[in-house]
């Protein structure tokens, strides 16, 4: 056994606990508090197990789960970029690449390569698995927006055009889930006045 390798990997396991401290802007289903990145990742991973039959293409579910669990770890260093923060989005890629290099350099080389490869695959949208993972990354907050009574949308004065722009590629991974979200999560919040319909 290579004890140095094990110790280095266990230290990384301790480090990624910090994902639990990265706060998102989506309320939990009860609307009482905001979720964190780790809760978001866990929720999507379980959703991947349950909803993979609705992917546009056949997917390797373990790969989808892996992509979902890894893709936001960089936010430990880069922080969460709010979906509607146009200024933050301008530097998001640069900050996240630097964070990925810093984060994964703390692993043994082969594991660092594996984790970085998963992150890159998610970012590039090039595989069926990454496209479906992106759909779930968008579907999950829409589900919580609706479950929490549209609280974050209402508080932020969000407009339908913003939500549609944010989800412009959601159907690439699952047309079925995107159509479901529009009908069951988005439209009800428009009807209740929590999301402003600014599209004629």
Each language-model region and where it sits:
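Alpha-helical, largely C-terminal catalytic domains
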Residues: 1-200
């Amino acid at each position: 056994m290579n004890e140095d390798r094990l110790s280095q990997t266990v230290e990384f396991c301790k480090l990624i606990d910090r994902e639990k401290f990265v706060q998102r802007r989506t309320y939990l289903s009860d609307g009482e508090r905001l979720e964190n990145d780790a809760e978001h990742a866990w929720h999507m991973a379980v959703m991947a197990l349950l909803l993979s039959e609705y992917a546009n293409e056949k997917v390797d579910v373990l790969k989808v789960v892996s992509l979902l669990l890894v893709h936001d770890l960089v936010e430990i260093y880069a922080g969460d970029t709010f979906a509607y923060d146009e200024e933050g989005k301008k530097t998001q890629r640069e900050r996240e690449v630097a964070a990925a290099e810093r984060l994964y350099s703390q692993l043994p080389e082969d594991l660092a390569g594996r984790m970085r490869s998963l992150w890159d695959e998610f970012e590039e949208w090039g595989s069926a698995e990454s496209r479906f993972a992106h759909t779930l990354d968008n579907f999950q907050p829409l589900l919580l927006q609706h479950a929490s009574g549209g609280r974050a949308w209402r508080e932020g004065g969000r407009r339908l055009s913003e939500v549609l722009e944010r989800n412009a590629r959601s159907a690439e991974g699952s047309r079925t889930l995107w159509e479901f979200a529009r009908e069951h999560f988005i439209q009800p919040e428009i009807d209740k006045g929590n999301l402003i319909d600014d599209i004629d």
